[in-house]
Design a protein with these regions (language model features):
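Vicinal oxygen chelate
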Residues: 1-7, 29-116, 127-134
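Conserved beta-strand-loop-alpha-helix junction that forms the acyl-donor binding cleft
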Residues: 12-15, 107-108
């Protein structure tokens, strides 16, 4: 696996407030955002920050939004192909990660899966044909 974090996604309870905080408060540059979009992305130096409704992020990862197992944050590592996603996912499992959601074609047009590291931190491994996050 190439040692790089592509996208950090915060599961947020109040998307409008968080958008205002990061865009207006911190001055982070928005990427391709239109009012009403569920996902807000900020292009940072070498990585991206995403804001996504907390309940939708939990649903995407197939975990409960409440209780243990979901902190409201998913760290993403992007690969340039579906095959790359499968390889990294297998590598993570071989290293001791737990499969949360096997890689599959997803609603936003990409391909992704989720695993938890040995302490339960949630990682997404994804191929995004719409944006080069690799």
């Amino acid at each position: 696996m190439k040692p790089k974090i592509s996208l950090i996604t915060f599961g947020v309870r109040d998307p409008d407030r968080m958008l205002a905080f990061y865009r207006d408060g911190l001055g982070l540059p928005l990427h391709n955002y239109k009012p009403g979009d569920d996902m807000v992305m900020f292009r940072l130096e070498g990585t991206w920050l995403g804001l996504f409704p907390r309940d939708e992020l939990a649903k995407d990862a197939t975990v409960s939004v409440e209780g243990s197992g979901f902190s409201g944050v998913a760290i993403a590592h992007n690969e340039p192909s579906k095959e790359g996603v499968d390889a990294v996912f297998a590598e993570a499992l071989a290293a001791g990660a737990t499969a949360v959601k096997a890689p599959e074609d997803v609603f936003w047009g990409g391909y992704s899966g989720y695993f938890a590291d040995p302490e339960g931190n949630l990682w997404e491994v994804a191929f995004n044909p719409l944006t080069d996050l690799t």
